[in-house]
Amino acid sequence: MILLVRYNEILQLGFCMTTQQSSSELLISTSENRTALTTDVQSEHVNAAYAYLATLHSENSRKSMASKLNVFSRWAGFQDLRDCEWDRLRPEHILAFMASREKKGQRGSTSNCYLAALKGVAKSSWIAHGMNHEDYLRINALKQRRYYRLPTGRSLSYSESRALIENCDLETSIGARDKAILSLMLGCGLRRGEIPFLRLEDYEPKNRALTLVGKGDKERRVFLPQPVAESVNIWIEHFRGTEKGLLFGRIFKNGRISLGDPLDPSSVGRITKRRMEEANHEKATAHDLRRTFATRLLANQVDIVTVKKMMGHANIATTAMYDRRGDEAMQAAAEKAVL
């Protein structure tokens, strides 16, 4: 079987290959007895970092991991990930690098991201027959750092969320759009990175349902509470229109709505920040609206398995990290303990 993986997206991450390589394609040939990693360039050598980055589905993940691999490369004495000798990577190098970073105050979560990136490169090198099996196993055996930090972010109060929504003027296109966006994050738990790619044809007004592709390229169906559906319907019926395409788009100063000019996740973050400031509330991020959604479901006795599905999480442990009920929930639970 031949799997064809193009480097086009990887080349947009802020680094480049040689002219000869920039048009190359990565060919992964597999058979029962062996796995060979080659390119259409004359050299048989494959940069394991490029091969690893090609396996990542998210553009943000590729950018983040490429940045970390560049940091490691410079620490190891190379210019960047392009000329780092990845096939010679050993666990001792990784441990020394991690120790030097943590000595400067690097957090455990960041260390684990570096470790994941370097393990991924080691695996790509091993697949390409660059790194021997023993060295790969030694690197793969490195354990993640154990750490605990108090959870960041917060859950909005009901008065805050009401004021946030009511502050949007439905007489204007910007107000109607922003109310629909904020309602989807508060009432459906959507990520800010999911908002820009919602499409009208995936919305079912009669069923108050919306199908989307979220983090990790996972498709899920969300159901809109009545107030959320009303906000979305007002945006569509009074401003957006019913033509197929992106559900939300940019709105220019002259009032023109451009559905061919999508929002980006940072734009959704700025909308949240601006609306919170206009409502004179404590600072909150777009992700805090998602935390609010999960916290309220759990507070209303929705089982955590259902909440996990509604959030689009892969495991319950991730969902539990969104719980911001605080000491009040534990005090109420303590009253139910039976001696």
Regions found by a protein language model. Name each.
Residues 2-339:
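Conserved catalytic core of the tyrosine transesterase superfamily
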